[in-house]
Regions:
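Membrane-embedded alpha-helical bundles that constitute the cytochrome b-like, heme-associated redox core
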Residues: 1-156
Length: 156
């Protein structure tokens, strides 16, 4: 059954990208770009960057929520490829670091979502969790997509 899913996944990814790895790199890059939007709007929500992010508060909240949703969706094909096709790997320190950080990403996301919906936490908790989520995402991107773009090829 997994062979059929792998084949379908490969067919879908290669209909747009030159390879599944290229697709994975671009989806991860989109997630990190949206992560920058998340950090910027999150800081604005907490009263920081008001002079830089000059968007009214209700719009900032919507942008923050929607950029987070789309970033999460961008991570799904990447996670599928990493978990079900590649699996755990430790062939180099870079790959091992990537594998370990990949194990944390959805855990950090789940904790952040629990804190978003629970108002009974210190004010600093959400910014710390958001920053941690962004740091994990950037580390994953740097150990995969950035490496791919600089060492394999840049392009679709």
């Amino acid at each position: 059954m997994l062979a059929n899913v792998n084949s379908t996944y490969t067919d879908v990814m290669t209909s747009v990208f030159s390879s599944t790895i290229a697709g994975k790199a671009w989806f991860a890059t989109a997630a990190v770009a949206l992560g920058v939007v998340q950090v910027s709007t999150g800081a604005r929500i907490f009263g920081k960057l008001e002079r830089i992010v000059r968007i009214p508060r209700p719009h900032v909240n919507s942008i923050h929520r929607w950029s987070g949703r789309v970033a999460f969706l961008c991570t799904l094909p990447v996670a599928f490829h990493c978990i079900f096709i590649l699996g755990f790997q430790d062939v180099s320190p870079r790959v091992l670091a990537h594998t370990i950080m990949g194990s944390f990403v959805y855990g950090v996301f789940a904790v952040k979502m629990l804190f978003v919906h629970d108002r009974d936490h210190p004010r600093w908790a959400l910014p710390v969790l958001g920053g941690t989520m962004f740091a994990v995402l950037v580390t994953l991107w740097a150990t995969s997509a950035l490496w791919y773009f600089t060492n394999v090829r840049f392009g679709l």
